[in-house]
Amino acid sequence: MKFNPTRLEIFKNLFHSVAEEMGAALRRAAFSPNIKERRDYSCAVFDGAGKALAMGDHMPVHLGSMPMSVAAAVAALKLGPGDVALLNDPYAGGTHLPDLTMVMPVYTPAASLPAFYVANRAHHADIGGAQAGSMGLAREIYQEGLRIPPVKLLERGQLVGDLMSLILANVRTGREREGDLTAQIAACRIGERRLIGMVAKYGRGEVGAYGRHLLDYSANMMSLALATIPEGVYRGEDLLDDDGITDNPQRIAVTIRIRRRKAEVDFTGSAPQCAGSVNAVAAITESAVFYVFRCLLDEQVPATSGLMRPIRVVAPAGTIVNARLPAAVAGGNVETSQRIVDTLLRALSRAIPSRIPAASQGTMNNLTFGGTDTRRGNAPFAYYETIAGGTGAGPGCGGADATHSHMTNTLNTPVEVLEHVYPVRVQRYAIRRASGGRGRFRGGDGIVREIKMLVPTQVGVLSDRRKIPPYGLSGGSPGAVGRNEIVEPARDTRAARQKGVPGRRLASKCNFHAPAGTVIRIETPGGGGWGAVESKTREKKKKKASKRNRVEAFQG
């Protein structure tokens, strides 16, 4: 079949539209605000060999690791027509336990093997474990929730009821989980239907051929992007504040070797896996690498598995970037992934300084809470959210305020929805002024968010950048560190709020019981600044002098 670049563009957009429509269906059918409002989900399309052909414009931390989930499901199960695999095991293709992934084969008529796979991943607000929200402090993965290896949730199109019952018996909010899981099944079926329709219209041969062309095109574009980076060895390192169990900083180190249009990304020198939950599995580390190098390309280049062909990732086993069972990993997905990105960008800033921004907030500021709602007949509830912060400034532009960045791509939960669904009141939601780092271009400001618990509640905070600030680049100052506080019920008065009463400081990672009336205050970090402030002052003086000279020349 003769290659046609116009047809390539058509098929690129067709595959992408399938992933996007899957996401729209999942969002509309979901029960939980975390999926319906915050859009904490991702969808993708894969070829029959498990290579990603298209990814929705969803969550980078999900998408870059999803090929491993598909590979794990295909290796563990014989997936026939109508089957849907479910998994969340970080040590078998998953990321952390709240992220439940579904994988469905797509069989075209009369085919004996799948032509495609469709997959989606969604963060469930609770999947059991010791703490409501399944993101609490832990030393082992067994404390974090229900661990699901690749299993069939649907077989020949029929729900495996015993498995669903087992899952719902181990979570706090069974009705919500059932609704979200059903929405994920619907998203898979939408993807299957669209791909079968595509094959019916264009033929399996042409659709398959252009799928392979997309992989090759992505690989070639990544090779060209690597060719723009000077050959050499570039190193970077950064630290997590602690692991939640000890106060010891956790080191992430990377060496990037660029040679002959290829890159080796080596994390040798990173800290050993730690006692707490900020361990990342290999899928998370590869996902962060995928994201950073994808950012070097034009946005029109398709996000496929081909992008990783010229890139080799070395993540030593038993370290914080490739933890072994039974390490706890809930924070590795949300916090360590962000620090890996910061470390990679710092290394690349030594190679291509004019293209790399300063560090963004570097944390997702995860907040979980749960309990029983006495206003609604003691109905159980569990909620999860991440809170935005400042992004790093870059060459030629300041950072954005109050924005999710890098490995997350979620929205916020509207205050009206949050207060309607859960027994809480949002007392303050504002930009944290002057928290961005100073520089020729200033880092973005973070957020101040205050939530009052109206019933006794179990609360968890999983955050970072509370001790070590987001770095600036090219002479820019770091952004402000974040801060977590609790205001006891007796101190939360109108007069105290007007005076800005300080709260009791919380650790970056903690779990606690909050009596009714307790206020949780989260102040998120600002982004780092870029460029020295002095250069900005000199530039203003030059502009004034130039203007004065032009006026004098005109008058003369």
Predicted regions and their residues:
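Glycine/proline-enriched, intrinsically flexible loops and inter-domain linkers
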Residues: 1-109, 114-264, 268-556
